[in-house]
């Protein structure tokens, strides 16, 4: 599994003008790392074997055809890789967990092998023609699982203290850097994506103050950027804080490490406000699902023509993959933030994946 489908290549081919730096969806670096949890993800892309190189090369070519930079996002799903449970395979995490399915703790040797897998995935990204990799340490995937006390109950060097919980993410960062240096890949971009806090009611995996310490440690490794995954909007703040997440984390970076934030950017006005007041660089996710030429329109002085909302008439211009279309025409968007105007296309939902074992809303994972 893990191959780039024709639908996926077409989807990215239509988004080569979405931005100047194009970051792919996640690729799992180990066979145990995926697929993850929603429709379309049974065909989630992998980069754990050389057999994935052909598709990765096509993907890089599609993204770069208009002169933009292409970055491959690499991750391990950990407990979120429920496709393995469906396929009667082990689901792994830092510690034994009982979710909707059993999750077993990784052994020491498996941890070391996954670290090496991130390096091998980076080497394949270089060979495929990508300009960089983004290490995905957000959204409850394995790197975040090691950092969170909710999913890391280990008592060895990989768990317990904050320093020990940072050990796995930092080991991955160093392995990726080592491989890039060994390959002699000049100007190869390395970024790190993280969720700035993990708080679910009274359950606290970590606070933004702890993740600031992780970021400070990552900055010492001289990465190119930190990418904050924000569900509350680009201007959101931690509860009880006076400053936005963007302002707090930007202050923790040096001049060489840039901050990227994402969240609720659907117009040129919002994009400019974010860059002027909260961050160095913006990432646009759902905005480019609605309008695949989001960035190009701003750069060519046509920002006022950006399409902000979904309509039935506009659907063909979005060029979504079948999985994305099915997810965003569900009334619950599978727990993901909905597309603006999505209620106008709920009647186009086909139900293709509704009974698929992986069609479990994000919040239930």
Model feature map: region roles:
Residues 1-365:
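Flavin-dependent oxidoreductase catalytic cores
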């Amino acid at each position: 599994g893990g191959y780039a489908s024709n639908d996926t290549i077409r989807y990215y081919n239509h988004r080569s003008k979405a931005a100047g730096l194009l970051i792919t969806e996640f690729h799992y670096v180990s066979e145990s790392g995926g697929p993850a949890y929603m429709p379309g993800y049974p065909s989630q892309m992998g980069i754990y074997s050389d057999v994935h190189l052909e598709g990765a090369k096509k993907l890089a070519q599609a993204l770069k055809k208009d002169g933009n930079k292409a970055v491959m996002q690499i991750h391990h799903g950990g407990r979120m890789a429920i496709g393995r449970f469906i396929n009667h395979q082990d689901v792994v995490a830092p510690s034994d967990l009982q979710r909707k399915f059993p999750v077993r703790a990784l052994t020491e040797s498996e941890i070391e092998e996954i670290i090496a897998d991130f390096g091998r995935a980076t080497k394949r990204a270089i060979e495929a023609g990508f300009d960089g990799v983004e290490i995905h340490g957000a959204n409850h995937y394995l790197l975040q699982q090691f950092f969170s006390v909710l999913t890391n109950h280990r008592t060895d060097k990989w768990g317990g203290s904050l320093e020990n919980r940072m050990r796995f993410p930092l080991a991955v960062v160093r392995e990726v850097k080592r491989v890039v240096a060994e390959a002699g890949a000049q100007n190869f971009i390395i970024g790190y994506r993280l969720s700035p806090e993990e708080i679910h009611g009274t359950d606290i995996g970590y606070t933004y103050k702890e993740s600031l310490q992780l970021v400070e440690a990552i900055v010492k490794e001289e990465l190119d950027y930190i990418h904050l995954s924000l569900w509350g909007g680009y201007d959101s703040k931690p509860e009880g804080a006076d400053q936005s997440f963007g302002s707090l984390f930007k202050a923790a970076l040096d001049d060489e490490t840039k901050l990227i934030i994402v969240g609720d950017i659907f117009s040129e006005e919002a994009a400019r406000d974010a860059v002027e007041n909260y961050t160095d660089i913006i990432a646009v996710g759902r905005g480019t699902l609605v309008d695949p030429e989001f960035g190009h329109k701003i750069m060519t002085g046509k920002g006022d023509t950006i399409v902000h909302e979904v309509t039935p008439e506009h659907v063909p211009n979005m060029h979504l993959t079948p999985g994305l279309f099915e997810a965003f025409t569900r009334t619950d968007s599978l727990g993901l933030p909905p597309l603006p105007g999505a209620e106008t296309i709920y009647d186009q939902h086909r139900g293709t994946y509704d009974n698929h074992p992986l069609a479990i809303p994000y919040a239930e994972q």
